[in-house]
Amino acid sequence: MFYNEKTGAVPPVPSNLNANTWHTVDLQPAPQLQPHAHTAPTVTPYLGLRARLSQLWFNRWTILLILVLVRVLILTAGLNDNIGDAKTKALSACTKVEDIGSAMASMPHYLSVGVNSMAADGITKTVSGMVKMLMMILTGVENLILFIINMYVGTYACLIAALIHGGLDVSVKVVEGATKVMNDAIGTITGQITESISDVQDAINKIPDTISSFLGGVDFDLPKIDITKNLDDLENIKINSNELVRDIVALNKTIPTFDQVENFTKNAIAIPFNFLKEQVNSSFGSYKFDDSVFPVAEKQALSFCSNNSFLNDFFETLFNVVRTAKIAFCVAIPILAVLAIVGMGYLEIQRWRREKQRSREFTERGYDPMDVVYLSSRPVTGGFGLWLSAKFKSVKKQLLVRWTIAYGTSLPALFVLSLAFAGLFSCLCQFIILRSIQKEAPALANQVGDFAGDVVGTLQQVSTNWADDANGVIIKLQDDINDDMFGWVSNATTAVNDTLNTFDDEIDKAITAVFKDTILFNTARNLVGCLITRKIETVQEGLTWVHDNAHVTLPLFANDVFSQGANNSVNGDSDLTSFLASPSSVTTDEITSAVNQVITKLEHGIVQEALISTALLLVYVIVVLSGAVRALVASAQKEKTRGEGGEQYGVKAPGSRGSSSASSGNSDNHHYHHHHDNSAPSDFDRKGVIYAGSVKRGRPGPERWPSHARKSSYPEVEGPDH
C-alpha cells in the first residue's frame, strides 16, 4: 500500500519498530500482477486472428494501390477526351493545310494560261521578227551576190575589152607603120634602081662608040634597057594598111561586153530568192501562234488528310496506347493489391503470433506499461528499434535510438510517407503513359513535315507534265520552221550554187566564143579563172555552210518552271515565313500542337503531383530529422547523479543479475533491482535490452513510499509498473 503525505494518510511505521534493518528492505518490490477479466478463446474484447485477416482486403497498401488505380483510370478517361479533342483539332488543321496545299498545287492550272499566252505572243513576235530578218537577209544576200557578180563581170569585162582593144590598136599601128615603111622603101628603091639603070644605060650607050672607034668606025646599035615602065609599076605599088587591119578592126567591133551573161545570171539568181521570199511571205508573213495548242495544267486536289489514314491511325494508336496502359494498370495494380493483401496477411499472422508470445511474457514479468503498449501495437517498428538499439552500449542511447525509430515510424508519419509513395507511384504510372505517347509523337511530326514535300512533289509533277506537253508543241513548231522556212533556205542555197555554176559555165562559154581562135584565149581563160571562178567557189562554200546550218532551236520550258520557287522555299532559300518556307514552324505547329497540348497538360499534371508527393516526402523527412535532432540533443545533455535527483534508465533484462552492495555481500538483496526468474528467456533477453522507463519531463508528481517503509529523503525510483 502507498499513501500520500498530502492527503492526510497514516504515516508509515518507524523503522526502529521494524524487525529488519532498512538494508533488508527491497525498495523495488516485485510488481503485483493485477487480475484481468476472464476471456474465452472465441469471445474476446480484442480482434483475433480471423477478425484481423477478414480486414486484410482494405489494408493501407491495398487502399493506396486502389487509389492509385482510380487516379490512373481518371487520367486515362481524361486522356481519351483530350486525345479526342486533339484529333479534332489536328484533322481541322490538316484539312486547312490540305486546302492550302491543293491551292498551291493548282497554281500551275491558273498560271499556265498566262504562261501559254505569254509564250504564244513571244513565239509570234519571234517568228515575225525572224521572217523580217530572213527577208532582209535574202534581199541583202541576193543583192550582195549580184553586186559581186556585177563587180566581177563588169571589172573583168572592162579588163578583157581593154586588153583586146589595146591589142588590136597595137596591131593596127604596127601594120600601118610597116605599110608606110614598105611604101617609102619601094619608092626609094625604085628611084635608086632608075638611077642605077640610067648609069648602066649611059655606060652601055658609050660602048658602041668605043667599039666603033676601036673597030674603025663600025657602027652597030646595042639594045637599050628600058625598065622605066616596070619601075613605074613598082613605084606605083602601095600597101594599104586598112586592108591589113580590116579583120582586126572588125574583131575590135565584135568584142562582147558580158551584158548577156550578167542579165542571165541576175535572172537565174533572182529565181530562188524570189521563190523563197514568196514562200516565206505566204507561210509566215502574217503568222500568229495559236496559244490554244498549248496544254493547260490540271487542277490538283491533294488528299493527304482525306484519303490518308495516317492521322486516324496515329490517334487510334494513341487511344490504343492509353487503352493498353489502362488495361495493364487495371491488371497490375490489382495484382499488386492482392500481393499486398497476401503480404499483409503474412505479416498479420506473424504479428499475431508475436503478440501472443509477448503477451505471455508481459503477463509473467513486469514491464514498463507504455513500452508494453508500444511493442504490442507496433511490433515491426518496435522490433526494429530493439535490433538497432542493441548496437549501442549506453542504456540512454539505446532508449533514444528506440525513441527516434518510434518517432519516425509513428502512424501520422507513416501515413504521410505512404501518401508520398502512393503519389510518386501514381506519377510513375502516369509517366509511363506519357512516355508511350511521346514515343508516338515524332511519327506525327515526321509525317506532317512531309506534307510540304508532298505539295512540292505534286507541283514538280504537274510542272513536269505541263512542260513536257508544252515543249512538245514548241518542238513541233521548231520542226515546222526548220522544214519549211529553213528548208526553203536550203533549197535556195542549192539553187544559188547551181546558178553560180551556170554563171561560171556561161563566162567560160563567152570567153571561148571570143578568144577561141586567138592567141589571147588561154590568157583570158586563166585570168577569168583566177579572178572570178575562185571567188565564186568561195561564195559556194559559204552557201554550203548556210545550207548545212540553216535551222533554228527554240528555247524550251524547264521542268521546274512552276515548282522552283516552292522547292527553294522548302530548302530554306526564302526569307518568308510561310507554309513552304518554314514547314516545321507552320505545319508542325498547326497539327502537332494538338498532340503537344495533350502531352504538355499531362506533363504539368505529373509535375504537380510529383511536387505534392515530394513535399509530403519532405515533410516526413523533416519529421524524421526533427526526431533525430531531438534525440541527439538529449544524448548530448549532461546527466545528473542519483544523489542530485537523476534518473535511472531502465533495468537489466530478465535473467541477468545486478551487482549487490559490496559491503553487504548478500546477493539476494538489491536496493534498486528486482528478483526475476531465469526460466523461459525471451528474444528481449537475447537482445540485452528491454522496455526502459520513460524519460521524465515536466513538473514532478508527489513522492510515494511503501506503507512499511519509513519516509526518506531518497526519491522514489519508478519501477516498470509505473
UniProtKB/Swiss-Prot annotation:
User: Would the keyword Coiled coil turn up in this protein's UniProt record?
Assistant: no
Q: Give residue spans, biased composition: Low complexity.
A: 655-667
UniProt subcellular location = Cell membrane
Extract the InterPro entries matched here. PRM1 (IPR026777)
Membrane spanning residue stretches: 61-81, 144-164, 327-347, 414-434, 605-625
Asked whether the keyword Membrane is assigned, the reply is yes
Any single GO BP term:
plasma membrane fusion involved in cytogamy
Q: What is its main location?
A: membrane
Q: How does it sit in the membrane?
A: Multi-pass membrane protein
GO cellular component, as recorded: mating projection tip; plasma membrane
Extracellular side residue ranges read 1-60, 165-326, 435-604
Tell me which UniProt keywords the record has, alphabetically: Cell membrane, Conjugation, Glycoprotein, Membrane, Transmembrane, Transmembrane helix
Judging by the UniProt lineage, the source's domain of life is Eukaryota
Residues carrying sugar: N252, N263, N281, N307, N491, N497, N567
Q: Where is this region: Disordered?
A: 636-722
| Cytoplasmic topological domain residue ranges | 82-143, 348-413, 626-722
The family annotation for this protein states: Belongs to the PRM1 family.
What is this protein's function per UniProt? Involved in cell fusion during mating by stabilizing the plasma membrane fusion event.
Please give the name of this protein.
Answer: Plasma membrane fusion protein PRM1
